[in-house]
């Protein structure tokens, strides 16, 4: 299989370059930080954690109510996004039917003050 053209660009979401997962709706089964690992996910039969089957990706609990899962990723550096690879390899039967991507550019994130809403 031929790789998409955008894979020749720098991966702005690479943890080795400083990208970080900031927050997510739920990562009970598999941590959000796995989203930033390089390469395709792997599957290891028989490997389990105290929360269930070990998965090399981000996995939340199934929802019994409406809504969706989300994850905020701070890219390593500002840049132009030429493409996104949402790898659901090994998540057969437990993958989203669709996904959306939103982006914003915020300068000086260390100086942002979050007000408490009461």
Descriptions of predicted regions:
Residues 63-76:
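Short beta-strands within extracellular/lumenal beta-sheet-rich domains
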Residues 79-91:
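A short beta-strand element within beta-rich, extracytoplasmic domains
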